[in-house]
């Protein structure tokens, strides 16, 4: 299989439904990524698929194309009721469910198959109104799906296709009981097409997932390299006292067009946001405490380029495709080595290159050996000059204070910068 982003395999080479091919090509999708080239032939032949591939390699399009093709090629149950969707796509987070729904809209418009969305925290009545009119494909999180099912707003007895996206994350977050509850209300596995996809699939997860699948075929792309080969990784060892100053110095040096900074707790994220906002950066905060409408608005502003920096917990690390992220900063090394892969997978997507910079501080440096064992290589270490770190930083903002706008004009590249370590002052450790 080619190591490049796209293969020579075209969607039109497959026996995909003509409307699916037309919808894909209308959005500029002609050639398959490796995971699409592997998964589509299996799904089109009616085989269940468990696909593992790095983030940003086209998993979502693989299962959406398969789902739409299957529904267009197989008639619905003649006794199907209005509250019975034909396909169910389950995601671990609200943001991912919304994104999948957005990606599916082009296929929906051209094929006429109707979409529904179900996620917690917001829009209960609005989502329900769509479901009451009947949907073909329902995309959602398990909690809201169960809520609607228990109230008979939806009935899963006519499901023909089921998808688990970011399946390992769903199990890790404790959704296994919810998933099994939903599966028990569907037709048997042999009577439906089953697919699951994720960047990481442990043996435990595959074993649990295969309970609900029909002799699934396991496919993977580049299993020997868990981090994308287009991502340049770099590691620093700061003291706790110098950690924030190093981050801000690196931001001045790198001047990223669009970056995500990950930390392990919401309080740490709030602290980072406060320092960067006070320093004039256009920065957004994404944690579990941020209201759902605001979270979606922040993601939209970041995607559209109105924000340059997103500070986030791992709520934003899984499955979200935000184009043109040039840098990922691990302010804290994650406790879960799989989260490292998902975090840095926000950059270097869709054939682009990216940079991942991690800070192994005194508190989280002990997480490094497990991460390096998991990814199969050591992260290159760079040194920095403590005396050259930025030291004229303003006091951080606090969320309890009325925030100044983060949407002001970005500083131009020729704007004066504070004194900081020049690029050639950063040296790779031997």
Swiss-Prot record:
Keyword annotations of the record: ATP-binding, Cytoplasm, Helicase, Hydrolase, Nucleotide-binding, RNA-binding
Cellular-component GO terms for this entry: cytosol
Annotated compartments: Cytoplasm
Enzyme Commission no: 3.6.4.13
BP term (GO), one: RNA catabolic process
Motif Q motif positions after renumbering to this chain: 9-37
Binding site for ATP: 53-60
Region Disordered, annotated ranges: 392-430
Cytoplasm keyword on record: yes
Domain Helicase ATP-binding residues, every copy: 40-219
InterPro entries named in the record: DEAD/DEAH_box_helicase_dom, DEAD_box_RNA_helicase, Helicase_ATP-bd, Helicase_C-like, P-loop_NTPase, RNA-helicase_DEAD-box_CS, RNA_helicase_ATP-dep_RhlB, RNA_helicase_DEAD_Q_motif
SUPFAM superfamilies in the record: P-loop containing nucleoside triphosphate hydrolases (SSF52540)
Quaternary structure annotation from Swiss-Prot or TrEMBL: Component of the RNA degradosome, which is a multiprotein complex involved in RNA processing and mRNA degradation.
Family assignment from sequence similarity: Belongs to the DEAD box helicase family. RhlB subfamily.
Role: DEAD-box RNA helicase involved in RNA degradation. Has RNA-dependent ATPase activity and unwinds double-stranded RNA.
HAMAP family: DEAD_helicase_RhlB (MF_00661)
Protein name as annotated: ATP-dependent RNA helicase RhlB
Species name: Pectobacterium carotovorum subsp. carotovorum (strain PC1)
Gene name linked to the record: rhlB
């Amino acid at each position: 299989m080619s190591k490049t982003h796209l293969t020579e395999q075209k969607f039109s080479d497959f026996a995909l439904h003509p409307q699916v091919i037309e919808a894909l090509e209308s959005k500029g999708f002609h050639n398959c990524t490796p995971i699409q080239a592997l998964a589509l032939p299996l799904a089109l032949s009616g085989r269940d698929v468990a696909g593992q591939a790095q983030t940003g390699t086209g998993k979502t399009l693989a299962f959406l194309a398969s789902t739409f093709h299957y529904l267009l090629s197989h008639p619905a149950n003649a006794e199907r009721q209005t509250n019975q969707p034909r396909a169910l796509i389950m995601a671990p987070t609200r943001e991912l469910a919304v994104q999948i729904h957005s990606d599916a809209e082009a296929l929906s418009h051209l094929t006429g198959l109707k979409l529904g969305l179900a996620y917690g925290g917001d829009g209960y009545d609005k989502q329900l109104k769509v479901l009451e009119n009947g949907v073909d494909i329902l995309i959602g999180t398990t909690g809201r799906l169960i809520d609607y099912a228990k109230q008979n707003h939806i009935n899963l007895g006519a499901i023909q296709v089921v998808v688990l996206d970011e399946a390992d994350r769903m199990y890790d977050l404790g959704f296994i009981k919810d998933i099994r509850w939903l599966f028990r209300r569907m037709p048997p596995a042999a009577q439906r097409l089953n697919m699951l996809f994720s960047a990481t699939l442990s043996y435990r997860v595959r074993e649990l997932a295969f309970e609900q699948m029909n002799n699934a075929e396991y496919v993977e792309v580049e299993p020997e390299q868990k981090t994308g080969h287009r991502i340049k990784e770099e590691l620093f060892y700061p003291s706790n006292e110098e950690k924030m100053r190093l981050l801000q110095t690196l931001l001045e040096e790198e001047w990223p067009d669009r970056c995500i900074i990950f930390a392990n707790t919401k309080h740490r994220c709030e602290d980072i946001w406060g320092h960067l906002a006070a320093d004039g950066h256009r920065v957004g905060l994404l944690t579990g405490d941020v209201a759902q409408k605001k979270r979606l608005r922040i993601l939209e502003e970041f995607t559209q380029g109105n924000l340059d920096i997103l500070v986030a917990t791992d709520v934003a690390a899984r499955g979200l495709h935000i184009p043109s992220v040039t840098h990922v900063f691990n302010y804290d090394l994650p406790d879960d080595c799989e989260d490292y892969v998902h975090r840095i997978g926000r950059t270097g997507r869709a054939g682009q290159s990216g940079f991942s910079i991690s800070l192994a501080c005194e508190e989280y440096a002990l997480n490094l050996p497990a991460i390096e064992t998991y990814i199969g290589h050591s992260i290159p270490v760079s040194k920095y000059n403590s005396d050259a770190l930025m030291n004229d930083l303003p006091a951080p903002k606090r969320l309890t204070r009325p925030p100044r706008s983060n949407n002001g004009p970005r500083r131009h590249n020729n704007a004066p910068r504070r004194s900081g370590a020049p690029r050639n002052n950063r040296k790779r450790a031997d």
